[in-house]
Amino acid sequence: MRKLGLLLMTILLGSFCQAQSRMEAGIFLDSLSISQTSTNNFGLGARFGYRVHHDVMFEGELAYDYGINFDEGYRNITTGNITALERTSIGVTHGLFGPTLERGAGHFHPFATLKAGFVDFRLSPSLLPQSNLASVILGLRTSNVNAALYAAAGISATLGPVGLRLEAGDEIYFNNGARHNLRIAFGPILRF
């Protein structure tokens, strides 16, 4: 009985340790250029991945971009002319999940990824109560949580279990059509 218990423990711990070498975690600095507001938002994020195949990793990530001020224009709904400007703050939270194709061996790992998720825009409240004005970014004000698709490529360099990762891609959110936005992320990773 004791030998059977030791054998089962060895098998379970061995498979657990093997599974641990298939994971990756990291934090990153994030830059997102929002096309509708022409702002460059910066923030922090974290990512976790699990390797399901030698060259395929499923990753989930969440990033919080701090608020940036910009001038929001308001159009007169009868004439179509911009009649007011207001200083507005916009912040972004985005979460994405999907596969990453990455060469697993060696010290340099080029990769490509396609992820889906959400983009949540945090806009400061509007101070203009006039009923004949409409914001030029009305779609973001009425629907601040939007579906997103992210296609990117990059490279990671590792030395043992630690490394650095750089990626750039197009984060597309859907708000009255597809909106393309450049996104760049850079930060340390840990493989275990």
Language model: regions and residue ranges:
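Gram-negative (and chloroplast) outer-membrane scaffold detector with strong preference
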Residues: G49-S131, G160-P161, F174, I184, ...
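Cleavable N-terminal export/targeting peptides
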Residues: M1-R22
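Short glycine/proline-enriched turn or capping motifs at secondary-structure junctions
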Residues: R2, N175-F186
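Short glycine/proline- and aromatic-enriched beta-strand/turn motifs that initiate or cap beta-hairpins
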Residues: Q18-H54, F58, A116, A185, ...
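Extracellular loop and loop/strand-boundary signature of outer-membrane beta-barrel proteins
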Residues: S31-I34, G80-R87, S135-R141, E171-N175
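Transmembrane beta-barrel strands of outer-membrane/channel proteins
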Residues: I27-S31, G60-Y64, A112-F118, I155, ...
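A charged, solvent-exposed segment within the mature domains of Sec-exported extracytoplasmic proteins
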Residues: F121-E171
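Residues that define the transmembrane beta-barrel architecture of outer-membrane proteins
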Residues: S21, N40-L44, G91-G95, F108, ...
